Regions:
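Generic structural "secondary-structure junction" signal
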Residues: 56, 112, 134-135
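FNR/FR-type flavoprotein reductase catalytic core
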Residues: 1-107
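Iron-sulfur (Fe-S) cluster-binding segments and ferredoxin-like electron-carrier domains
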Residues: 81-82, 86-89, 93-94, 101, ...
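Functionally engaged cysteine thiol sites
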Residues: 78, 110, 127
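Cysteine-centered iron-sulfur cluster-binding motifs in ferredoxin-type domains/subunits
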Residues: 107-118
Length: 138
C-alpha cells in the first residue's frame, strides 16, 4: 500500500503520509517517503512514533487542523481492508466523501477483470477500476 501513496506524494508534492504498522520492524520505505513529504508513523505497540492505530493518529491530526485546512485535503488510503475502513470512517467525520480515494489490498489473480478476485463489495474491480476507488457519497 505504501508504494502507491509514496508515488502520489512524490509526483504531486505537498503531502503528508501517515504510516501504520504493528511494530517498528514492520515499517518499510520510510526514508524514501521522508525525502518527498512529511511522514507521521503509528505503531500498535508504540515501538515507533505514535502508540496506537494509524486511524487514531489520523483523528488526532485532523482535530488539530482548522476547518479551512481540512477543506483543502484529499485522502488516498492504501492498505488492508480493516485499516482502510477505519481511516475512511475518520475521514468522513471531517470532510466530504468525494475527497476520499481508497485502494484496499485485495488479492489480484488475472489482472484484467475477468476472475473478480479483486472485486470490492460494490463490484468494482481494483485491477481495472482502480487502483484507487472513490468513496461513495451515499
Amino acid at each position: 500500500g505504501l508504494a502507491a501513496v509514496y508515488q502520489i506524494a512524490r509526483d504531486f508534492g505537498e503531502a503528508e503520509i501517515l504510516v501504520g504498522a504493528r511494530s517498528r520492524d514492520r515499517l518499510y520505505f520510510l526514508d524514501e517517503c521522508r525525502a518527498c513529504s512529511t511522514v507521521h508513523v503509528a505503531t500498535d505497540d508504540g515501538s515507533e512514533g505514535f502508540h496506537g492505530r494509524v486511524s487514531e493518529l489520523l483523528r488526532q491530526r485532523l482535530e488539530a487542523m482548522s476547518p479551512a485546512e481540512r477543506e483543502r485535503l484529499v485522502f488516498y488510503n492504501c492498505g488492508p481492508e480493516p485499516m482502510v475502513h477505519a481511516a475512511v470512517a475518520v475521514q468522513r467525520e471531517f470532510c466530504r466523501p468525494e475527497r476520499i480515494f481508497s485502494a484496499i489490498d485485495y488479492l489480484t489473480k488475472c489482472g484484467v477483470g475477468i476472475c473478480g478476485a479483486c472485486a470490492a463489495p460494490d463490484g468494482r474491480r481494483l485491477c481495472v477500476d482502480g487502483p484507487f476507488l472513490a468513496e461513495d457519497a451515499g
